[in-house]
Structure formats: structure tokens, C-alpha cells
């Protein structure tokens, strides 16, 4: 009997010891500076207030209609609160927009259409699942139509200046066909034949009255949302300084090449740059060599 009582006492002592240990641990945790706080977060999430008068490439956006207003509101919310992508786009604007603006002025394309490049590729040489490439997401057939060279060694869809010029010419052609820059943007996304077919079937000639695919239904609104944020980022909570923005890649000289380069690495080193620098400034060069046909001249950018 005494042994049983002794064992019971030992059990109670052990239980009390464990209980006190747990209580002590909890007390220490509550005092640690790493304890979770349930204080309100020091930020506020706001809805987006739409302006009463919004235009796209000089054409009115009928935000007085609830359907149009809500479609734009959706894209504004998505782009405003997609923080990392929006910040990267803001940083890249200073690098690429001046060149786009200059080429568009020369080709008579409204400046608002520069935001199409963000909607298409986020200002990068992207590759889509359908095979579209570059800043302007040209497919091979359209690229060739507007003078971009594509072969095993070269893809000028990745040539920023040339592809921007081609995009401007394509948009101008679409505007001539549809009589509207808004419809031109929609046609750029879904293709002119498909857009014309939808317009004929629905007997409508205004983008905002058309019922198109989900992607094209959202496309112009996405460009509009990007435009609103990019032109006044502080209104949407983005406060970037000049030092935050990426520098333009405009300090380079042009070297004309009229004969085959068996090694682009050797060519780079001969011009006192690295192979990587050569590729960064000339992403249209696909391989490590460049065959050049007689009479052909390629202009390669060499950073200073």
C-alpha cells in the first residue's frame, strides 16, 4: 500500500512539474518581442474612384454606363493591387517609353497606345504559349508582313526599335480599316478578321457595345487601367523616386557587320564588352554566331 501511495505522490509531483513548466513557457512567450500582434495594420485598402471623363487615344470612354464603369473598375483594382508587377512596370517606363513615344510620333500613332506594350509583355521580350514574341507579341506571319526578319539566327521581334516601328505600322493599318484606335487595339489582340466577324454578326461598330472573347473584352480596359496608373502613380499609392527608375539603355554605338561572325563571344571581346552585354543590348541575336549573306548588313549595338 505504501508503495502505491508513493507512486501516486510521484505521479502528482511530476504532473505539477510539467504543468508549471508549461505555464512558465507560455509566460515567457507572451513576453518575447516576437509575439504576434493583433493590432490593426498601418495601411488602408481603398476602392478606386473613376473619373467622370476618360479618353483613350482621343476617343471617349463611356463610363456613364455601369457595364463600362465596372469593367474598367475591375482592371484598375487588379493592376493597382498587383504591387510587384506594377512597380516593375513603373521602373521600366523610363527605359523604354521615350523611344516608343518618338517612334509613335513619327508614325502618327497616339501616345496612349504605348501602354499596349505593358499589356502585351510588361515591357519585356516575352514568349506566349501561342508563339507570339517580343515587346509587341508579334506572331511570325504578322512580323514578316511588317518587315521583321526571323530565322534560326535572328528574331527581330526581339529588336526593340524595329518591332516598335512594326507595331506602329500595324496599328495604323488597323485604324485605317476600322476607323477607331480603340477598335484597332481590340483587333491587335484578337485579330482583324475575328473582330470584323463579331462586328458583322452583332451589328455593332463600337468596342464598348461588342460582346467579344473574355480576353478581348478585358483588353482595352486593361490598357486604360495601366494608363491611369502610369500617368499618376501617386494617386494609386505608388511613390517612386527618380533613383528607383531604371536607366535607359541609350549609351551605345552601332557597329555594322557585313560578314559572318563565327563567334559572337570573340566579336564581343574585340569590342571590349562581354558576351552577356552583347546579348542584353541585342536580344534579337539568337545563337552564339551570326551567318551574314553577301550584300547583307546588320547593325549591332555596342554599349559604351
Regions flagged by a language model, labelled:
Residues 2-108:
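An acidic, Gly/Ser/Thr/Pro-rich helix-cap/linker signature
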Residues 86-97, 106-109, 128-136, 156-164, ...:
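Solvent-exposed, acidic/flexible segments
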Residues 131-152, 164-167, 171, 195-198:
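Substrate-binding/active-site groove segments that recognize
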Residues 279-304:
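Extracellular LysM carbohydrate-binding repeats and other cell-envelope/extracellular binding modules
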Amino acid at each position: 500500500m505504501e508503495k502505491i501511495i508513493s507512486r501516486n505522490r510521484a505521479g502528482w509531483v511530476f504532473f505539477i512539474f510539467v504543468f508549471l513548466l508549461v505555464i512558465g513557457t507560455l509566460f515567457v512567450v507572451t513576453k518575447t518581442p516576437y509575439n504576434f500582434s493583433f493590432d490593426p495594420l498601418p495601411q488602408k485598402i481603398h476602392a478606386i474612384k473613376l473619373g467622370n471623363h476618360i479618353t483613350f487615344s482621343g476617343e471617349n470612354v463611356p463610363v456613364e454606363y455601369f457595364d463600362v464603369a465596372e469593367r474598367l473598375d475591375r482592371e484598375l483594382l487588379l493592376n493597382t493591387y498587383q504591387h510587384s508587377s506594377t512597380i516593375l512596370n513603373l521602373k521600366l517606363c523610363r527605359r523604354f517609353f521615350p523611344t516608343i513615344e518618338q517612334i509613335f510620333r513619327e508614325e502618327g500613332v497616339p501616345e496612349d497606345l504605348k501602354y499596349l506594350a505593358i499589356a502585351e509583355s510588361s515591357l519585356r521580350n516575352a514568349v506566349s504559349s501561342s508563339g507570339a514574341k517580343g515587346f509587341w507579341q508579334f506572331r511570325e506571319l504578322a512580323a514578316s508582313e511588317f518587315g521583321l526578319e526571323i530565322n534560326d539566327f535572328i528574331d527581330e521581334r526581339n529588336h526593340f526599335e524595329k518591332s516598335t516601328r512594326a507595331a506602329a505600322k500595324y496599328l495604323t493599318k488597323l485604324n485605317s480599316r476600322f476607323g477607331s484606335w480603340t477598335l484597332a487595339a481590340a483587333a491587335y489582340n484578337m485579330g482583324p478578321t475575328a473582330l470584323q466577324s463579331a462586328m458583322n454578326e452583332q451589328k455593332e461598330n463600337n468596342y464598348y457595345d461588342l460582346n467579344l472573347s473574355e480576353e478581348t473584352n478585358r483588353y482595352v480596359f486593361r490598357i486604360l487601367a495601366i494608363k491611369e496608373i502610369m500617368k499618376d502613380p501617386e494617386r494609386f499609392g505608388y511613390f517612386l523616386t527618380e533613383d528607383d527608375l531604371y536607366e535607359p539603355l541609350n549609351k551605345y554605338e552601332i557597329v555594322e557587320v557585313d560578314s559572318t561572325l563565327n563567334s559572337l563571344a570573340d566579336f564581343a571581346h574585340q569590342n571590349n564588352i562581354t558576351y552577356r552585354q552583347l546579348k542584353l543590348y541585342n536580344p534579337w541575336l539568337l545563337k552564339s554566331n551570326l551567318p551574314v549573306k553577301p550584300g547583307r548588313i546588320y547593325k549591332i549595338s555596342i554599349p559604351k
